[in-house]
Amino acid sequence: MADIRITGRMVNFSRITFDTNDHDVIRQQLSNILNEGSYQGTVVIIDSTVEQELIALIQLLVSMGLQPMAVIDGILGDEARAIQFPVLPADQPLQRIKPTAEQVAIVEKPTSAQASVETKKPLNNNAVAHITSYHDEILRTGQSLVQDQGDIILKAGMNSGSEVIASGNIHIYGTVRGRVIAGAGGHAAARIFCQSLEAELVSIAGTYCVADDIPKHVVKKPVHIYLNEKQELEFEALEL
């Protein structure tokens, strides 16, 4: 029997992009973010648009309960290699597009049981905006559709090399061949629904699964994807 085994490639991770190298500012802003979600112990990938003292930044993240795993190649690449810290290839640039339409609802914060209602009144301290983005056309290769305040509904499919990201749920009425990322920001109750699953990657709240690991019985089938009690991705074939 071999002494080495390679198993599934699903893991919880988040990507953090830094636009400042002021560690006091980073600590303050990260503290606010971490207090809003269940990020304790999360594996993180570091990206930066400015020069950083990488070792000090890694130590800062560890002190805040995060687990730095790698950096994105670019400004930090050479410094990371010098200390033998993992470097991941930089992303290919995507064109962020606007949805065909958006619907805004005012909802109570999660602590309230009140239903969402649409209103034109200003937000109060107990309410937040929930936005649903609708897109009528196929998402083409190199395009990205992002909604960081709610859900996304694609009325057509998406090509390989495209990407859809939502803080909430994602519904795709067509074939999925790109990357589908729901629950961005740590919303573990988010779900993904699609008519035909051929995705390059699916992710909910940082737990992801690449194409090779998607269960064969749901490939090219209507699928409901969610996180179970163990925070593992579940793929449920749907009968339409």
UniProtKB/Swiss-Prot annotation:
InterPro entries: CAP/MinC_C, MinC, MinC_C_sf, MinC_N, Septum_form_inhib_MinC_C. The keyword Nucleus does not apply. Transmembrane segments: none annotated. Coiled coil: none annotated. Keywords: Cell cycle, Cell division, Septation. Gene3D superfamilies: 2.160.20.70, 3.30.70.260. It comes from the Bacteria. The keyword Cell division applies. GO terms for biological process: cell morphogenesis; division septum assembly; regulation of cell division; regulation of cell septum assembly. Cell division inhibitor that blocks the formation of polar Z ring septums. Rapidly oscillates between the poles of the cell to destabilize FtsZ filaments that have formed before they mature into polar Z rings. Prevents FtsZ polymerization. Interacts with MinD and FtsZ. Belongs to the MinC family. This is Probable septum site-determining protein MinC. It comes from Acinetobacter baumannii (strain ATCC 17978 / DSM 105126 / CIP 53.77 / LMG 1025 / NCDC KC755 / 5377). The lineage of its organism: Bacteria, Pseudomonadati, Pseudomonadota, Gammaproteobacteria, Moraxellales.
